[in-house]
Amino acid sequence: MVALSFYIMYPLFYYYTRKESRYHKVAKLRKIWCDIGFILGFYSYSAEYEVDVDFSKPMIIVANHTSYLDTPLICTIISGNYHFMGKVELLKNPVLKLFFQTIDVPVDRSNRIASYRALKKVEENIHKGFSLILYPEGTMSKNPPEMGEFKAGAFKLAVDTKVPILPISFLNNYKLMKGSGLKYGSRPGIMRAFVHKPIETSNLSTPEELENLSKQIFETLKSKL
């Protein structure tokens, strides 16, 4: 249903992703797109916020990843300008490739030079006021709600750019649609999320502090699963 609603809105997405000066409209369009998809699929959602979050300032938003519902849900419960970072294979996705060819940043982890360029592009976007959304596991969990080992990229980016990290726990998406839903099926229901308070990184710099930050985020996300 999310794919169907995407094609309904494709002309608008195409127009607003053609020029960087129009990117600030994309987040609102994504929210409308995902809300339509949820209505068509008989999904609703509930998000609890630990504190009021100022989404007008750039941050790095991280979440556990268990379902194809995660990305559309995150688009509906946050605001402000943002972009995603994801594996280069998403360029082959018929729905997502439009975004990863324009506003979002694909990363080829098998190519160090390409990975470096992707990280520099993300840093540029953050300095322009765009938050970054990524899944620190780098892939979907194979045994939800358990999380896999985190990649260091998100936390190094946060320390390098001195922006806070906003952890979001998706509590039950995998129960409604595990993975893509093709193998185990899917069912309508209420998706639930918990938006934790932002974690500051401006005073961090050493490798030890970076490792501790990763552990802190892991435990923060895990605390609500």
Question: How should these model regions be labeled?
Answer:
Residues 1-18, 24-28, 51-54, 124, ...:
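Membrane-interfacial terminal anchoring regions of lipid-handling membrane enzymes
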Residues 10-20, 24-28, 40, 55-112:
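Catalytic core of membrane glycerolipid acyltransferases/transacylases, capturing the structured
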Residues 47, 61, 84, 134, ...:
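Generic preference for hydrophobic
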Residues 47, 105-108, 201:
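Short acidic-hydrophobic, aromatic-tinged amphipathic segments that line or gate anion-handling sites
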